[in-house]
Amino acid sequence: MMACRDPKPGAKRLVRAQTLQKQRRAPVGPRAPPPDEEDPRLKCKNCGAFGHMARSTRCPMKCWKAALVPPTLGKKEGKENLKPWKPQVEANPGPLNKDKGEKEERPRQQDPQRKALLHIFSGKPPEKPLPNRKGSTESSVYLRVASGPMPVHTTSKRPRVDPVLADRSATEMSDRGSALASLSPLRKASLSSSSSLGPKERQTGAAADIPQPAVRHQGPEPLLVVKPTHSSPEGGCREVPQAASKTHGLLQAISPQAQDKRPAVTSQPCPPAATHSLGLGSNLSFGPGAKRPAQAPIQACLNFPKKPRLGPFQIPESAIQGGELGAPEYLQPPPATTELGPSTSPQMGRRTPAQVSSVDRQPPHSRPCLPTAQACTMSHHPATSHDGAQPLRVLFRRLENGRWSSSLLAAPSFHSPEKPGAFLAQSPHVSEKSEVPRVRVPPNVLYEDLQVSSSSEDSDSDLE
């Protein structure tokens, strides 16, 4: 019985088990429909046809024998814009589109009207159309002719000067420049100030032979009197004009009644630029040699270049008789009290005439400048009588507080032996200590001995 049994049931079991395993390995996704059942929503990725998938046996790409050419799809008009430069006109445009179209048409119609109105009001001819190239080449000849307005000549250019006047002014300037070049810098300043005066003032100054007293000015700007001369022997006291000389005339005619009245002595400081601008050519009177005390720098009146053959005590006849304009006027010693303010010590305030003349005769290059001196004073006494008078020398000292004290030094005269005796009687120790080097004096002694105030000057001038 056992042999008669069919072994097929065991084989069937194995086949079933294999099929179950294959089913388990398969993906869980949807299965493809049978070939008879097609879904038009599906599209084949290989051929791009609808109704089957790429793995379907109906795909023509898998079975080329049954492959068919896919039919061409019909064109849909309006889908593609074949002429994009032409706007599409809608059949029923909206209200907004209508307004835009009307606004575009209005300015086109108004353009010719505006042009006509502009031609009427402006009066210009209507614009002509541009000519062709042939016409332009022919009309270019007419464009070369200048049709613009003539240039207007303005007065910005300087007027033309007459050549005769120009030559005359050039010669005058050259002569003036050569004359100034031969003079010292101090005299250049005086000549430049005198040249700034008008012709009328020069004539009045030339006609006046009267000695001019110093004028007292009350104001912030100091004024110094300058008398320009061509010959300046030693002893003449001159000052450099500064900023005040630009506004006031220096040469003024004084009535003869002013001769009897003695003018007040003025002592006014100058701007410091005057002393710094002095070169080596200017004559300055100092102590013996180049020695001077450090704390009290001494500066006397400025002396202009003098004639080499004039002696220290010779007086030209022009000075005695009055002479021409510019003749040197010598300061006369006042009676008794010849110093301003309190009397100074004879050791520091007096110098012998020989010492003064020896200092003045020194060459210009051996005289050092005074950069520390910041002011200069001027004392002017008009000559009452020129008979036998000798020039005076004014000695200036600078104090601690910035003030300046002045003292008069009279030169001995051979014609009047009385005055030198009086002068030597007042200062007996001058001749003895003139050759001895100066002793350094403390500043407090100088301040006590040499302090001069404006009140003391006024009182001394009134007494004299």
Swiss-Prot record:
Biased composition (Low complexity): 178-197
Region described as Disordered: spans on this chain: 1-42, 70-293, 312-390, 410-442
InterPro entries from the UniProt entry: FAM90 (IPR039213), Znf-CCHC_6 (IPR041670)
Biased amino acid composition, Basic and acidic residues: 74-83, 97-114
PANTHER family, per the entry: FAMILY WITH SEQUENCE SIMILARITY 90 MEMBER A11, PSEUDOGENE-RELATED, PROTEIN FAM90A1
Entry's family note: Belongs to the FAM90 family.
Protein name (database record): Protein FAM90A26
Originating organism: Homo sapiens (Human)
Gene name for this UniProt entry: FAM90A26
